């Protein structure tokens, strides 16, 4: 029995960007709590490996290929989930372009790259929510967690802009869907030690960032799990429209 007892038993969760990194850890944690998990990723081989690992530990998982920037692909993800598990209770919008991201200024970034980047990193959360919310409502409601970032409060060019958009999207959708008992919140991690981060952020920049964090270290993907599970759980049943920093104290607001 997991931390939340049998609360997640017989529930169905979709985690996008779950073929590795933070999304993988979210998917594995939900499976350990008893949820059936759809491991959704544009890299279907990575998703299948994660799903196989979950099933190897006695969990229930399905790998699904999804391009979150494509409305039809998001709808197909929802359809495959319904066909396999019969419903949808939770969605974690984690998919993003980050590893290998082109660092550039807003005034000079290639326009086609910018549009693709925003279609995944911001619009993807909207398209996946649109694909699943009616299915959640049919089950009496549900919960959605969006992945934001402390980059929303720092200068981070178009990556930070996308996360500002995620924060606004979280609050607007939570307001629209609250009447259907669908709660939507966001987690804003600080710098997390993942392969994607190691290939994108120069290490001297990482060292400077860590100097400004009260807990004096980068986060680990596992540091985000507690907040994700809490926000999906019934313990958070009166919490919606909120952005929660999980960042070692990097950003503090009064």
Sequence positions of predicted segments:
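Canonical Rossmann dinucleotide-binding motif of NAD(H)/NADP(H)-dependent dehydrogenases/reductases
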Residues: 6-38
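The beta1-alpha1 cofactor-binding region of Rossmann-like NAD(H)/NADP(H)-dependent oxidoreductases
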Residues: 44-45, 65-77, 111, 222-223
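Alpha-helical segment proximal to the catalytic Tyr-Lys
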Residues: 134, 175-179, 237
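Active-site helix of classical SDR
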Residues: 129, 162-165, 170
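Substrate-binding pocket helix/loop in short-chain dehydrogenase/reductase
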Residues: 102-106, 110-115, 158, 209
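Short C-terminal tail/terminal secondary-structure segment
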Residues: 2-4, 98, 102-103, 154, ...
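Active-site loop of short-chain dehydrogenase/reductase
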Residues: 11, 59-60, 87-88, 123, ...
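Catalytic Tyr-X3-Lys loop
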Residues: 107-126, 141, 145, 166
């Amino acid at each position: 029995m997991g931390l939340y007892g049998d609360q997640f038993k017989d529930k169905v969760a979709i985690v996008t960007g779950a073929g590795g990194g933070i999304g993988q850890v979210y998917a594995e944690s939900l499976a350990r709590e008893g949820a059936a998990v759809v491991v959704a990723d544009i890299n279907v081989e990575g998703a299948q490996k994660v799903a196989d690992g979950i099933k190897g530990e006695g969990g229930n998982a399905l790998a699904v290929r999804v391009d979150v920037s494509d409305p039809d692909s998001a709808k197909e993800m929802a359809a495959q989930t319904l066909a396999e598990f019969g419903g949808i209770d939770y969605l974690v919008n984690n998919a993003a372009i980050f590893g290998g991201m082109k660092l550039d200024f807003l005034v000079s970034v290639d326009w086609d790259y910018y549009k693709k980047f925003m279609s995944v990193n911001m619009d993807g959360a909207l398209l996946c929510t649109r694909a699943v919310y009616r299915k959640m409502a049919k089950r009496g409601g549900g919960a959605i967690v969006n992945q934001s970032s402390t980059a929303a409060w720092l200068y981070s060019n178009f990556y930070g802009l996308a996360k500002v958009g995620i924060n606004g999207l979280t609050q607007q959708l939570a307001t629209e869907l609250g009447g259907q008992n669908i709660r939507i919140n966001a987690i804003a991690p600080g710098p997390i030690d993942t392969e994607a981060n190691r290939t994108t952020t120069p290490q001297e920049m990482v060292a400077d960032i860590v100097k400004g964090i009260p807990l004096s270290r980068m986060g680990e993907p596992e540091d985000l799990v507690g907040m994700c599970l809490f926000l999906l759980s019934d313990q958070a049943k009166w919490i919606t429209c909120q952005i929660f920093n999980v960042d070692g104290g990097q950003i503090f607001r009064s």
